[in-house]
Amino acid sequence: MSFTQPPVSPQHNSNSQHSRSPLRDVNSLDAKQMRKRAWWLIALNFLIPGSAQMIAGSRKIGRVAFIATLLLWALFVVAGLLALVARGWLLSIFGTAFLAEPIAFFLWFFGGLTIFLAINLLRMLNLNRLVPGQRLLPLIALVATCSVAATTLIWSGNTVSAGFSFVSTVFKQQGTIEPSNGRYNIMLLGGDSGSDRFGLRPDSISVLSISATTGAAVNIGIPRNMQNIHFVAGSPMRKVYPKGFDHYCGGDCMINAIYKATTDNYANLYPDAKAHGSTPGLEATRDAVEWVTGLKIQNYALINMKAFASLIDAIGGIDVNVKKALPIGGQQDCVPANNAHLSDCPDALGWIEVGKQHMDGHLALWYARSRHNTNDYDRMRRQRQVEDLVLKKIDPITLLTKFGAIAKAGAALVKTDIPAGAVGTYVDLAFQAKKLGIKKLELVSSSYPRLSANNPDFRYARVLINRALKKNA
């Protein structure tokens, strides 16, 4: 007769294993072991959310949290790979609702889940079993790790949401853009900041030409007072001005007056402008700029100069080396004694003094746009200087830490017809251009005497442009 041990049920066997686990069976642990257990669980909860519950708590909660953790890791790995090899695709996510919105909600959900897991873990730790003097430090560690994880995740969700809001608000057009002769050419206009004058009289006009392959960029500055302007072949404005832009402003027909002339009198010539995210004034200005430069302009970006000040505030201001004292406000040219005496210029509201200064958006805008005691060419130089300083200030760290404020300012800053599908391509090229450095070509008489504002040699201007583009292909 043989005797055998009775079979052990799976449930009994599982319970036996649980009882042998020091992380789960707290009744058999002393205060020292409980302290060690607490630190292990806090570390696991931070590094692998859900693992602490799977080992020492509710396996159901642990499994849900662990699956969410794997999804989060997969999301970060994919984002990291795209950032390295296909940054344009990564940036395109911001313009895709069915991708950006679920990602933002998932990050917010995981941030909330992190807080829930920390509260659940606090109950599991049984800190009352520790020596009284050893209870506070694990509690602080749990709160700190939870705060770091939850804050990071919620901030990440906010960043994705802000990015989508910015892209969907600014880049409303659909489709993509093809390069022209291997380059993307974007017309940049700086509009007056008054609500009743926005865009009606561009303060600054330039063309940013970017190589589609290398990102090498040239910023071509066009003086706002350039005259004898014609329109590119095929432009409806040629019917009105067959011999060039004249008969509107009494012999002083500057290029920046085209916007208002078209808006007020010839808007019917561009019936499809609004449907394509533009305006008749912008389209007429584009036709003129294409004639001046000889370049095909794929897109425009109209900058609201008042909102530009908000962008400067969002990045924490800029540091400017002021070469000449400039008045804030005022309508009279005057020479201040010692660079800053209001008594010499009674209508000025204040002075921007010579020397290195840290400027907020309001002061930087006045520095870039002040008209008095200066000329248009110096004004163009100051505008480019401010633009360069802003671009240099928006480094990856600033972009990440202040993305929400930058995106909010940017949404009010730009009106453009760049389609959402081209945002990734343009931003990717912008990073390359910033790395290479943006070359400048100012079509002004101070640099090229043949380009006088009232009678410029446009053939010569196009030679200069082609030469600059070949050097930066």
Which sequence ranges carry the predicted segments?
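Terminal targeting segments of Actinobacterial cell-envelope proteins
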Residues: 1-52, 92, 116, 128
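Hydrophobic, aromatic-rich membrane-embedded alpha-helical segments
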Residues: 33-68, 72-73, 111
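Membrane-water interface of alpha-helical transmembrane segments
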Residues: 35, 59-66, 93-107, 135-138
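Cytoplasmic membrane-interface segments at the C-terminal ends of transmembrane helices
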Residues: 53-60, 114-136
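Membrane-embedded alpha-helical segments of integral membrane proteins
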Residues: 71-126
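Alpha-helical transmembrane segments
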Residues: 74, 109-119, 147-154, 424, ...
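Internal/C-terminal transmembrane anchor helices
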Residues: 131-162
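Non-catalytic, solvent-exposed segments at the cell envelope interface
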Residues: 155-473
